[in-house]
């Protein structure tokens, strides 16, 4: 028993610990500022980003043209187009480098970063459609027009369902409790928080593979011939 204990202790001493993503100091300061505005902000972003990374659709590189990198989602039924300005990236200005396409116009993503706590209102369109495009749930017989007038959408994953319930019901209300109870057995992979903290963060905000901040966002809508 004593020998086994010593081996375990030696293993722990020799184990290389990863401190976390190696970000510049200004990035840590601004992330901390956002966390202080909404305590759940960072952990929610990391968890949902990981879930989509494992089972959802991906954002893939398409081409480079005229100083921009063009990207699109692998979800062909609900396709979104994004691009990033390489000149801004060269200036280490990642916040305003990304743009999304809506009604044939390119809109800057990153307004939320200037005013933490209000980004959901400022870029609501982008956030909403990013979630739909990245989620791998089947969206059969589902129309955005039905959703906008208040019809339920039970064909989405548990995470999406719970998010909409929480968004459109009052805190601690009986309505919210009843709806969450209905969907509690919906199949979905839950990602524990300790795994979320171990994922490296790079230059791309919304994926575990290409991002500076794991910043969960929805994008402008292309697909099903729908314009915003």
UniProtKB/Swiss-Prot annotation:
Q: Where in the cell is it found?
A: Host cytoplasm; Virion
Q: What is this protein called?
A: Virion infectivity factor
Keywords on this record? Answer: Host cytoplasm, Virion
**Originating organism:** Ovine maedi visna related virus (strain South Africa)
Q: GO CC annotations?
A: host cell cytoplasm; virion component
InterPro entries per UniProt: Lenti_VIF_2
As for family, the record states: Belongs to the ovine/caprine lentivirus group Vif protein family.
In its keyword annotation, does this UniProt entry include ATP-binding?
Answer: no
The keyword ATP-binding is annotated on this UniProt entry: no
> Corresponding gene?
vif
Which Pfam family would be a valid example here? Lenti_VIF_2
């Amino acid at each position: 028993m004593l020998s086994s204990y010593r081996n375990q202790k030696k293993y722990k001493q020799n184990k290389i610990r990863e401190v976390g993503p190696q970000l510049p100091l200004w990035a840590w300061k601004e992330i901390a500022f956002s966390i202080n505005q909404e305590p759940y902000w960072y952990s929610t972003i990391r968890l949902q980003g990981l879930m989509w990374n494992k089972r959802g659709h991906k954002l893939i590189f398409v081409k480079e043209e005229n100083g921009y990198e063009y990207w699109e989602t692998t979800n062909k039924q609900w396709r979104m187009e994004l691009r990033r300005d390489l000149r801004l990236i060269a200036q280490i200005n990642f916040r305003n480098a990304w743009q999304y396409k809506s009604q044939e116009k390119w809109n800057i993503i990153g307004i939320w970063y200037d005013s933490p706590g209000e980004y959901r209102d400022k870029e609501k369109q982008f956030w909403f459609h990013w979630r739909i495009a990245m989620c791998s749930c089947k969206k059969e017989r589902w129309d955005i027009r039905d959703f906008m007038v208040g019809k339920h959408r039970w064909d989405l994953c548990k995470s999406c369902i719970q998010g909409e319930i929480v968004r459109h019901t009052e805190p601690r209300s009986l309505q919210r409790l009843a709806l969450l109870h209905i969907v509690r057995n919906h199949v979905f992979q839950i990602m524990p928080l300790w795994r979320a903290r171990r994922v490296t963060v790079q230059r791309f905000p919304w994926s575990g593979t290409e991002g500076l901040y794991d910043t969960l966002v929805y994008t402008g809508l292309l697909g099903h011939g729908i314009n915003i």
